[in-house]
Amino acid sequence: MLRNFLLPESIARADGAGPEIDLGSKRGKLLVLTLGITRILEQESLEVTVWGSPDGEKWDSKPLAKFPPKFYCGLYSILLNLGSRSDVRFVRIHWKMSRWSKRESMPMFGFYVYAEESGARVSVAVA
């Protein structure tokens, strides 16, 4: 089973973006994106979006996919169908954090995002 981390596990304290990732053989495929949240403070949320580009320089004006806001540790998966977007060669993760605690502390999340072709787990189990 081939897994591509779009964002390796990281601790983040501010909004940010991950590196540009070349989709390679996964261009134009149906992908399962998994967001793993391993660390979180109370009273904060994390929003993760996936952006696409044909060349790694010029990025779409809207995200290709968006995870709903998350408030707890766990694994969350969504589908990214690139079947109609064969022009997308690169993807990049962006994240936004918010905190509504009365404390002055900054938000903090430990998280990662990886992508695998839909059906990859089934193929491995059958083999």
Regions found by a protein language model. Give the residues of each.
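Solvent-exposed serine/threonine-rich low-complexity stretches and specific carbohydrate-binding patches
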Residues: L7-S10, S61-F71
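N-terminal "first-domain core" detector
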Residues: M1-L41
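Noncatalytic modules at the cell exterior or secretory-pathway interfaces
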Residues: G28-L35, S84-F109
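Tryptophan-centered short beta-strand motifs
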Residues: A17-E20, G56-K62
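Short coil-to-beta strand junction motifs in C2/discoidin
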Residues: L41-V48
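C-terminal interaction-tip segments
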Residues: M1-R3, S10-I11, R27, S98-A127
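Exposed aromatic-hydrophobic patches
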Residues: P19-L23, C73-G83
